């Protein structure tokens, strides 16, 4: 969470500019991320640092895909795949009759907020879209799982939740 987002931006900048010093620093940040096993800490403005968080998973997938683009090292792709798997428990892979927007919708975090309510079971579309973006990145390089299908499902869920007419 706290590490993946900044690392992603540094890796992308290093790849686009060709700056070797920035690339070395960004890749060092990726080595430091290897100690983490649970996606968490990406939404500290509202939620406790320790709670599982799909935004952290999405940022980690994207960061490792960017590291793979920069270096071609298979280990980065393996890490991207790992973080993609950690995000799947946040995605509703089923639906309940009468709740048409449930299927492929995404829960942001598995705990509470610093404020007055729980986020448990409540979808937050934009967090899911960050994760879906990461899955699309991964699908370019990895066909071990239908990552693109999951990403498209999340996108379709987001589209179903938009009002096309009438009051919102």
Indicate where each model-derived feature is located.
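Glycan-recognition and catalytic cores of secretory/periplasmic carbohydrate-active enzymes
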Residues: 1-168
């Amino acid at each position: 969470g706290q590490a993946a987002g900044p690392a992603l931006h540094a890796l992308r900048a290093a790849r686009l500019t060709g700056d070797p010093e920035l690339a070395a620093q960004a890749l060092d940040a990726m080595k430091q991320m290897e100690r983490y096993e649970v996606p968490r800490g990406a939404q500290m403005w509202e939620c406790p640092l320790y709670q599982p968080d799909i935004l952290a998973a999405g940022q980690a997938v994207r960061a490792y895909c960017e590291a793979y683009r920069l270096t071609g090292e298979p280990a980065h792709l393996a890490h991207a795949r790992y973080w993609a798997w950690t995000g799947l428990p946040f995605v509703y892979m089923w639906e309940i009759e009468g709740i048409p927007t449930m299927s492929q919708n995404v829960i942001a975090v598995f705990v509470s907020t610093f404020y007055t309510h729980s986020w448990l079971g409540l979808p937050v579309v934009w967090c899911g879209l960050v994760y879906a973006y990461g899955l699309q990145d991964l699908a370019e390089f990895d066909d071990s799982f239908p990552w693109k299908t999951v990403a498209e499902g999340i996108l379709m869920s987001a589209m179903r939740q938009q009002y096309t007419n009438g009051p919102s």
